Amino acid sequence: MKVSDIRSKFLQFFESKGHTVVRSSSLVPANDPTLLFTNSGMVQFKDVFLGTDKRPYSRATSSQRSVRAGGKHNDLENVGYTARHHTFFEMLGNFSFGDYFKREAIQYAWELLTKVYQLPAEKLWVTVYAEDDEAYDIWAKEVGVPTERIVRIGDNKGSRYASDNFWQMADTGPCGPCSEIFFDHGPDVWGGPPGSPEEDGDRYIEIWNLVFMQFNRDEQGNMTPLPKPCVDTGMGLERIAAVLQHVHSNYEIDLFQALIKAAARETHIDNLNQNSLKVIADHIRACSFLIVDGVIPGNEGRGYVLRRIVRRAIRHGYKLGQKTPFFHKLVADLVAQMGEAYPELADAQGRVTEVLKAEEERFFETIENGMSILDAALADLKLKGGKTLDGELAFKLHDTFGFPLDLTQDVCREQEIAVDEAAFDAAMNRQREQARAAGKFKMAAGLEYSGDKTVFHGYEKLELPQAKIIALYVDGAAVDAMQPGQTGVIVLDNTPFYAESGGQAGDQGVLKAGNAVFAVADTTKIQADVFGHQGTLEGGALKVGDTVQPQVDALRRARTVRNHSATHLMHKALREVLGTHVQQKGSLVDADKTRFDFSHNAPMTDEQIRRVEDIVNAEILRNEDTHAEIMPFDDAVKSGAMALFGEKYADDVRVLSIGTSKELCGGTHVHRTGDIGLFKIVVEGGVAAGIRRVEAITGDNALHYLQKLDAKLNEAAAALKAQPSELVPRIGQVQEQVRALEKELERLKSKLASSQGDELAEQAVDVKGLKVLAAQLEGADVKTLRETMDKLKDKLQSAAIVLAAVADGKVSLIAGVTADATGKVKAGELVNFVAQQVGGKGGGRPDMAQAGGTEPGKLPQALSGVVEWVSAKV
């Protein structure tokens, strides 16, 4: 039974039992930036189990794409070396949300395994939680499993309810006993039944886990029965496929064998048992589906996990002798195997291939040098009897050659060498500190502050009647007073000035007190809740304790908030037009424009840009209210607010709803979408592999841009004596006229070449029966020189000829020798003789050669020596 059949039979079976077939969710968990990747079937139903989400069904079944790499769920180092570890796997599952419970879950599992998949009942063992008599009795008395094949597993992990057979989502919340089903491969395979000292052997393999969410656990550890118990089951597709296909390793199933053969084809390897081929076959699945779901190779978060997996695959290809990109070529083979079950993979085939190819090309530039250094270090270490690689070297490989630490560890592990992780971490932390120090705003570097926080009023107000100066800094040092002309930083107890944060530039404006005026050039954060107003005291004097009137530059703020609000609308529009793989990778919003970096692998087409503009401007025309609300982080993400993975959020966050966009954001925004006025994208380009950048303008900036564009359009129309509406067809007419004139010019040049040929032929000098000619043609291009050369060779029949022309201070040369004379005179040598005298060089065939030069003033003398040079040859 093929993998595809096993998957479809599972889903069809549970659909026949009243379950709704739910498509696999993304590998990037929706609205849960705390979870690196989806790693089980229940992730997309987490809120249903917690009671915070309701679905229109109470029974569900799915085949969930899952990844375990990075974070606490990390199988990376074992992949390729064991029979059942993978970075990517599919989890088959059936779920009950307060519908059926243990009896039906157990009976369904047994029916599927023994009736549909036709596994021998005598080969199946089960485990139950030691105190779960209900499940035990169902297995023994209703299903009929002999008691000798039912194993009770107690608290075997050091504390109450800490057991392989007791599941809990977290320290508190839904939990309950579970029952696992094992397949017995028979006495020919070493290993003992679950719960025995030999349980880690390969004879008894767990194939299905049935979790019974029966209790709610509080902070004191008290267990309270749930009013509506739930069921969550998971069966690894690769594991059950190995059992049904009568093989002991997941890598022997049909899907993996096809990918292993494809990897062998691209790496030119005949031995299909190479562990490196297994690594490559596993990794192409994880990498491809991560890219499908919007992850792009990068240096942090999910992007760095993807980069690590890609580079591990490349290293194993390199180990097999592959020195050029190969990994991306396996995407087509993966689509052939899994594209029908997951059409999103087939749809994204081109994008996935391009992203992987770009990452391969990047790493292949450095892998050879990096591996040479690592191999030399390991050889030296072995000679000295060492067992640990220097962490500083591992860091150098990471920093200079792009070797993730686990890749270096992978290479070392193959030679039974450890890596000094502590030294690696120390080097990494040292670099981070240096980068952090170098990146500090120079005015804020070293500022020491331990006073009160700044209270921000800028959401509602642009000026305050008074605010107190609570700290002053000049040249990075705290001072009591500031004198006219001095530049420094002022901290206020209250301010309407927005401090640079979240990609939004800090406010500008003034602080006034009597005749004292402090011009604020920028506002930044000295600490998380302490705002530094940086600028110059243009008049008067200020001291700590003085009261000032803060006034934000209203025009600049208005332009900034228009750009910021438009960014939110644009982000949503980009995801709508390009796909949900689009994720924010950086932004800068100021009064002039919004700059937005996002994950996408191809340049946007003109049509896509227009669609994004249309969507945003439609939101602007609807003129809907903007709403900001403070709420707990968990509630915010559950409400659908977009959060950025890797960002650190407080317990309470600000949710900004503008139009159809909903994001976590602490920035300042318009009151209504109509306040943005107008939105226009002015720049689209690439900034890194898989990262695009869009720049856009709004409001009066957009209007002025379009007015300038209109003025240029009118100017161009006037130059062509046309109305702006007639410009395109008029340009077409002009282009047609230009083409006609160019054609006529070519005809005239050809005619000129013919007439010049007749005249030049008469200038040829006879040298021992060979006609020799060296001449400069006025106004000729290279094509004309060639045509003239051909006519002269035909006319003179036996000849050695050099023709030259000068244009834009450069010399063009062509030498031609008739076939009867090439034994003595070579065109390449002849043209070089002339070219070297005019600052150039050239070459070509014995009968025709071309050259160029940069010193036209020396051309007459160079041509005058041709006859003598040919005479010496013949």
UniProtKB/Swiss-Prot annotation:
Subcellular location, record wording: Cytoplasm
InterPro entries for the chain: aa-tRNA-synth_II/BPL/LPL (IPR045864), Ala-tRNA-lgiase_IIc (IPR002318), Ala-tRNA-ligase_IIc_anticod-bd (IPR018162), Ala-tRNA-synth_IIc_core (IPR018165), Ala-tRNA-synth_IIc_N (IPR018164), Ala-tRNA_ligase (IPR050058), Ala_tRNA_ligase_euk/bac (IPR023033), DHHA1_dom (IPR003156)
PANTHER family per UniProt: ALANINE--TRNA LIGASE, CYTOPLASMIC, ALANYL-TRNA SYNTHETASE
Sites where the protein binds Zn(2+): 564, 568, 665, 669
Function: Catalyzes the attachment of alanine to tRNA(Ala) in a two-step reaction: alanine is first activated by ATP to form Ala-AMP and then transferred to the acceptor end of tRNA(Ala). Also edits incorrectly charged Ser-tRNA(Ala) and Gly-tRNA(Ala) via its editing domain.
Annotated organism of origin: Cupriavidus pinatubonensis (strain JMP 134 / LMG 1197) (Cupriavidus necator (strain JMP 134))
The name this protein goes by in its record: Alanine--tRNA ligase
Record PROSITE patterns: AA_TRNA_LIGASE_II_ALA
EC number(s) given by UniProt: 6.1.1.7
Gene that encodes the chain: alaS
Lineage: Bacteria, Pseudomonadati, Pseudomonadota, Betaproteobacteria, Burkholderiales
Cofactor note: Binds 1 zinc ion per subunit.
Domain notes: Consists of three domains; the N-terminal catalytic domain, the editing domain and the C-terminal C-Ala domain. The editing domain removes incorrectly charged amino acids, while the C-Ala domain, along with tRNA(Ala), serves as a bridge to cooperatively bring together the editing and aminoacylation centers thus stimulating deacylation of misacylated tRNAs.
Keywords: Aminoacyl-tRNA synthetase, ATP-binding, Cytoplasm, Ligase, Metal-binding, Nucleotide-binding, Protein biosynthesis, RNA-binding, tRNA-binding, Zinc
SUPFAM superfamilies tied to this protein: Class II aaRS and biotin synthetases (SSF55681), Putative anticodon-binding domain of alanyl-tRNA synthetase (AlaRS) (SSF101353), ThrRS/AlaRS common domain (SSF55186), Translation proteins (SSF50447)
